[in-house]
Amino acid sequence: MHCGPAGSGHFAKMIHNGIEYGMMQAIAEGFALIQGKAEFALDAAAIGEAWRHGSVVRSWLLDLTVDALGDADALAAIAPQVADSGEGRWTVDEAVRQGTPAPVITLALMSRFASRGNADHANRLLALMRRGFGGHTVVRA
């Protein structure tokens, strides 16, 4: 597809990848909520399979998710860390340059950072601050 002058195609692809970050994050969070509702004993893979056929959220990303949910051993063997290859960062940078709000893409990128333990120090400080001002409990490492 020809988008326009030099660089416009790369720009469009960058935005595509930023949208992908947000969509992936929403799908993963939704299935985490399904998994977390233990009293319903929901079959996440079966729900995802139903959504693949005629649901408004049907997509290739949902197909990949359902495939992953169907292999519990493989899913359990994966560390809960998500890399980024730069496109999300570039999209967020562009949003800042334009002054255009892009909270979903930004939070999806931040979630990837947090998955790598980059927030551990900040979270420890938050816990200690809460204990300091309100006597809230902290969980020991």
Which sequence ranges carry the predicted segments?
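Helical "substrate-binding/catalytic lid" subdomain
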Residues: 7-136
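Long, positively charged, glycine-interspersed low-complexity recognition regions
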Residues: 139-141
